[in-house]
Amino acid sequence: MNKEETDQYYIEETFKLALNGKFTAHPNPMVGAIVVKNGKVLGKGYHLRPGFPHAEQEAIKNAGKSVENSTLYVNLEPCYHFGRTPPCSNLIINSKIKRVVISCLDPNPLVNGKRDKQLKKSGIEVKVGVLKNQAMRLNRGFFSKFLLKRPNIICKSGISLDGKISLSNGISKWITSEESRLDVQTERALSPLIFSSSKTVMMDNPSLNIREPLLLKKILKQPDLGIVDRTLKIPLNSKVFKVSSRKIYLFTSIKKTTKKYKKNVIIVYIQSRKGKINLMECISFLAKQDINNIFVEAGP
């Protein structure tokens, strides 16, 4: 392989490593890193969850020996600022890494381009943009939050072969297969928040949670809920309120209520217009709560 092909190969490998954090890294991006010297992989790492070591730190640590004059591959620009963990820039510089290949810059204004410049000032060769589009797709929710000012949104819809989404008599009934329901469970696990409506909750009385045993072992917590309930008519004994370990945002146009909700229920006032709540105002609110991805499950 030539140098360009080699760079692409190892960046693709960082994508695979990054996926180890797909259920747990949120709200941080998924990041993988590899340290290579003379064609040999010295160390690999990935970011598992907030507060845990960053991928670059793990890769350098797992090398178990000097990484001087090596190349570090990482799918996202290394952090520059102090957060839950210290910035990786000093570690990379002090480790005397010779070259850093970055798939794409971090859209976070606290980071964007700053690490790139700092590394170059320290005499490290920096290459940016290898498989950039793939890297952005990998963390589409993270990029959406900073570039579009809203989370990435995925909508689920169960449709029969004749193009229907429910029975004509309004009775709730599964029209999806076991395989597709497992896909829904997986999408829920990948999303920090499920978005629905009062009509769906009242008609189907869903739990909107993760029940698949294998997925329960991988997630840190049940996804939060966002429900448009303009008049706060969802009964307090509904299944969605049974899981107390998650936040439930109720978007309503009612300023005060006598209903006694549990502490995990957050009432969010959104002024209605012509009897309807502006969904983009709900989405904007959720973006400010550090929600990168939203999975929409709502009927007609």
Identify the meaning behind each predicted range.
Residues 129-146:
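Short, structured interface segments
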